[in-house]
Each structure stands twice: as C-alpha cells, then as structure tokens.
Amino acid sequence: MFSEYLKFFLYGLIQGLTEFFPVSSTAHLKVISVFFGIDDPGPSLSAIIQLGSVLALVCYFRNDFFKLKIQSSKKIFDYLIHERLLRSIFIGTIPIILLGGTIKLFVPYFFDEIFRSNLSIALVSFLMAILMYIADRSKKGSINLKNHKYSDSFLIGLSQALAIFPGVSRSGVTISTALLSGWGRSDSAKFSFLLGMPAISFAAIVEFISSFNAFSSFSFFPLIVGLTTTFLSSLLAIHFLLKYFSSNGLKLFIIYRIVFGFVILLNL
C-alpha cells in the first residue's frame, strides 16, 4: 500500500522526467499507476503537477526572456524582453489553445475512453517512434532561435496541438517537426521547451477551472511533495536532454518508445 506522500513523489518524478524526454508524460503516468497498483492521476491531477515543470522552465530559461541591465544613471533595473522570441512563442501557442479549448468546451470527455486506453497509447508510441526516426535521419539544418521565421513557430505550434492526444509527447512531436523543418538539434530542443511553458500552463488553468471541486480531494502536503519533485526532476531532465540531444540525437528515445509500446501490448 503506497502512502500518499510516496504516491505523489512517484507522480512528480515521472511527470518531471517524461515531460521533457520525448516519451509522453501522460502515457507514463497512466501506465506506471497500473504497474504499481495506484490510482491513475487523471487529467486534473496531472495538469496541476505539471506546474512544477513550468516553474522549472522559468528558472532554467530565465535569461532567454529577460536580460538584466543596470542603468547607471538612474540606478534602477531595466528588464529588456527578447520580443522576437516571445512573439514566436505566442504564435506557436495559438493552435493548441484553439484546439484544446474547443475540445474542452464542446467535447470534454473526448479522450476518456478511446484515447486514454493502453492500446491507443501503445499504437501512438509506435507512430511517434517512426516520426522521431524520420526526423532524426533528416538533413540537419541551420535554422535557430535567432534566424527562424514566424511561420516556423506556427508550424511547430500546429504539431504541438497533437500533444493533446495521450501518448504523443509534446516535446517529441515539436522537436521532430523542428528537425524536419530544418532546425538544428540544440535550438529545436530549446524552442520546444520554451514553447511548452504557455501550453502546460494553459492546460493546468483549464483543468483547474473545469475540475475545481476535484482539487478539494487532494491532500495539501502530498501535493506539495509532488510539485517539488516535479520541479527538481524537470530541471534534471531539461539539462540532460539539452546536453545529450545536441550530440546524440533521438536514437535512445526511439528505441525506448518501441520497447515501451511492446511492453504495453504484452500487458493488455
């Protein structure tokens, strides 16, 4: 029997690591809950725990949004916002807000049966492995955070909208789309992470509003343990992937997604 603290620690650890590794956090939270015999956290709890990942993104990439400048004449701090990057993130976030918001408003239980099933998650894992393989084998381009077009941001944002389907992996599909569009490895991962900040926040806010009563059933201190674990494991995942991916590509994660898919199928 898992204690509440251990259960939320496990939720946070899995969420933090798999949110940024291209392997799907939603799929792992669901499958791990079955493996350990604990409750599926469901979309509401998953969304609120994801806020730990958002905080990790803010901390890790704070210098990509703000440049600190000390004005000697006025002796005040003036934060210069990287406007182009913020515009790109805004443009790339539009598709997932439109699609996710539409589904939540008009068909709120769209994913509960078919798309959250283990069979569906396994099949999506195989499809993502194929996409990631094609992207990893594509010719490496020179598009980066400084010279990209807003149309690049929108295209990657369109792919991010697919991440509302359980098992897709937001980072996996956006990194793959960036690589196929001619982005370099390092900046494709970096932009994917930055683009995830408003998307993850939006999901958490929508779930909080639509399932407000459900949050009263969560114990406060175990939830804090989950959020803290998510934050710390997210920082580790971001740092590791940026270092590893720039030199090694997606090979390790492609193999993992195939194995993960077969493990799910064998346990149906």
UniProtKB/Swiss-Prot annotation:
Coiled coil: none annotated. GO terms for cellular component: plasma membrane. GO terms for biological process: cell wall organization; peptidoglycan biosynthetic process; regulation of cell shape; response to antibiotic. It comes from the Bacteria. It is found in: Cell inner membrane. Keywords: Antibiotic resistance, Cell inner membrane, Cell membrane, Cell shape, Cell wall biogenesis/degradation, Hydrolase, Membrane, Peptidoglycan synthesis, Transmembrane, Transmembrane helix. It is a multi-pass membrane protein. It catalyses: di-trans,octa-cis-undecaprenyl diphosphate + H2O = di-trans,octa-cis-undecaprenyl phosphate + phosphate + H(+). Its main location: membrane. Its EC number is 3.6.1.27. The chain crosses the membrane at residues 41-61, 89-109, 114-134, 155-175, 191-211, 218-238, 248-268. One of its GO terms (molecular function) is undecaprenyl-diphosphatase activity. Belongs to the UppP family. Bacitracin is thought to be involved in the inhibition of peptidoglycan synthesis by sequestering undecaprenyl diphosphate, thereby reducing the pool of lipid carrier available. Catalyzes the dephosphorylation of undecaprenyl diphosphate (UPP). Confers resistance to bacitracin. This is Undecaprenyl-diphosphatase.
